[in-house]
Amino acid sequence: MRPWRHIDGRFLYLPASQDVWNQLRARLQLAQRLSGTAIWVPHPGAIGIGVDVDLPIGGFVDVLLLPRDTTQWPLEGTQMEFYIWWIDEYPQIRLLPADPRHRREDFDEWISSQNGPAAAAFRTHHSA
């Protein structure tokens, strides 16, 4: 069952059980590429976007990884590629758009100054 569900005119996030998440998480890695569809863009510029990645756990792109210019945000229904940005105990996959047009405008500069595991994995997998 898909985690993003449209109920009474709004999207709800109802992920699979923690056991399912633990099994799935063991097969995922930072900077891994996934295909997905933007299905929830509630308030451009405020929160981020919900993404259906065809798994029992949903994806989410945080507002801090998206362009400041909200006209560059993907629209609901946009199919695109993502990189896994973060995975932890909470059953949700944090994502980074693979297409630079859908990332924050200063992404290249910003990523070089980040010290976390997601940034390190991205730099390792995407260094020239």
Go through each PLM region and give its residues.
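Single-stranded RNA-binding regions, centering on S1/OB-family and related RNA-binding modules
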Residues: M1-A128
